[in-house]
């Protein structure tokens, strides 16, 4: 057999070399977070609204802290002042949305920071109303899934502690419960007449499927 017939055939993607691997930049990215362009837009709009450029992060965290206690969904009513007298938290939330990202994505970007600021000190205000047990109360915020996202802003010395497995499970379960409740409230009838709806909120009953417990 000739050497030419034993050679590696041409491929669309030639095998990578060790030198090439060493030169590739592999910073983490996540589509669960705002893009860098959106973050820059928020920062620019905040400065235009008279937030000092050196304070945009700390002022942003005031909004994140509110959402930690009250939620970051599109239906959350943001209230209260910021530390900048002329700017309310509601105005900051509007700036975030004007950038093209959602409030939850924005909060998720700062999740590791608020985790360090509040964990084991002051739980989310609504933890009990949300159905969390005391042992998992520090996971009772709706952007908890950003805490361990490596593309989010990281605290200078890392997380004060990683979430426990109980906290992860409690948050994931609570998220599914909220999805179930939203589905139950969805009305797919064409009329609100009780004759048509028979008093039902939805024409089909949503279900939650749980995995069996480990044996």
Swiss-Prot record:
Gene Ontology MF terms in the entry: structural molecule activity
Keyword Acetylation: yes
Pfam family, one: Flexi_CP
Keywords on record: Acetylation, Capsid protein, Helical capsid protein, Ribonucleoprotein, Virion
Entry annotated with the keyword Hydrolase: no
Job description of the protein: Required for genome encapsidation. Forms ribonucleoprotein complexes along with TGB1 helicase and viral RNA.
Family: Belongs to the potexvirus capsid protein family.
Protein name in the entry: Coat protein
């Amino acid at each position: 057999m000739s050497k030419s017939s034993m050679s590696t055939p041409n491929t669309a993607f030639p095998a990578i070399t060790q030198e090439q691997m060493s030169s590739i930049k592999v910073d983490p990215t996540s589509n669960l977070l705002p893009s860098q362009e959106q973050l820059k837009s928020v920062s620019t709009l905040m400065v235009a609204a008279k937030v000092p450029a050196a304070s945009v992060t700390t002022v942003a965290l005031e909004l994140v802290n509110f959402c930690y206690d009250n939620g970051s969904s599109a239906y959350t009513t943001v209230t209260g002042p910021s530390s900048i007298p002329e700017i309310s938290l509601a105005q900051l939330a509007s700036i975030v949305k004007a950038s093209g990202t959602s409030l939850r994505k924005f909060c998720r970007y700062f999740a590791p920071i608020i985790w360090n600021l509040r964990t084991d000190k002051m739980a989310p205000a609504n933890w009990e109303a949300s159905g969390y047990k005391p042992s998992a109360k520090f996971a009772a915020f709706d952007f908890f899934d950003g805490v361990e996202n490596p593309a989010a802003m990281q605290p200078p010395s890392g997380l004060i502690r990683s979430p426990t497995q109980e906290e992860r499970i409690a948050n994931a379960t609570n998220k599914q419960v909220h999805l179930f409740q939203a589905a139950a409230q969805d009305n797919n009838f064409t009329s609100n007449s009780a004759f048509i709806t028979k008093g039902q909120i939805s024409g089909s009953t949503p279900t939650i499927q749980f995995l069996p417990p480990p044996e």
